[in-house]
């Protein structure tokens, strides 16, 4: 009898942990919608970038987040710390600033960027440019795939004869970030 009570307690703890983590199986992929993205209202959410480092326990939350403003548009924010401000001169002050604005087309649980505007702090002001107008970028694609409370970004590019792929993981949170944090 005690054996079954222990097993039940362990299973209950596992179910609670999975529910708390917002885990979903791959066959639970959601079609992209305002509620899935957390556009507004009771479902309002933010997507925090996740960076896992080998050999370190826990998950590190990187210095960026995405806020979807509609089913087909998003704003991406980047956190600038004191070194970014004083040494690198990348921002006017410490905090989050708009990094990119993205327009998407949607299909199932994927969003594919059709237009990307990025910002750069130059000579004391923010300058906005379009990916398509960049002389260094010959081709690019940016796709987000959503599975439950997780999202994967894949950015593929060709620039001056070099090409590459960058992948970033995100998790959905309900509080607007005020600074990078660790879990």
What do these predicted regions represent?
Residues 2-4, 16-45, 170-183:
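Bacterial Sec-dependent N-terminal signal peptides
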Residues 6-13:
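Sec-dependent N-terminal signal peptides
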Residues 11, 28, 36-38, 43, ...:
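Intrinsically disordered, low-complexity serine/threonine-rich segments
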Residues 35, 45-50, 54-67:
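Low-complexity, Ser/Thr/Pro-rich intrinsically disordered segments found in N-terminal tails, propeptides
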Residues 52-55, 75-152, 159, 171:
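Contiguous, well-ordered beta-strand patches that form the walls/edges
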Residues 149, 153-183:
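Signal peptide-directed secreted proteins
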């Amino acid at each position: 009898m005690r054996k079954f009570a222990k097993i039940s307690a362990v299973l209950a703890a596992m179910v609670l942990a999975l529910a708390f983590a917002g885990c979903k199986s791959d066959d639970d992929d959601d079609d992209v919608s305002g509620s899935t993205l957390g556009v507004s209202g009771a479902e309002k959410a933010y997507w925090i970038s996740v960076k896992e480092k080998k050999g370190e326990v826990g998950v590190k939350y990187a210095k960026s987040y995405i806020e979807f403003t509609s089913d087909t548009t998003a704003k991406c924010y980047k956190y600038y710390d004191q070194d970014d401000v004083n040494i690198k001169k990348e921002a006017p002050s410490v905090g989050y600033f708009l990094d990119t604005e993205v327009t998407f087309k949607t299909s199932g649980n994927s969003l594919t960027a059709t237009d990307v505007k990025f910002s750069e702090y130059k000579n004391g002001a923010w300058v906005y440019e379009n990916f398509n107008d960049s002389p260094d970028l010959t081709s690019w694609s940016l796709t987000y795939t959503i599975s439950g409370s997780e999202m994967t970004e894949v950015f593929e590019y060709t620039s001056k004869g070099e090409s590459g792929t960058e992948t970033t993981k995100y998790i959905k949170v309900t509080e607007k970030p005020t600074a990078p944090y660790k879990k």
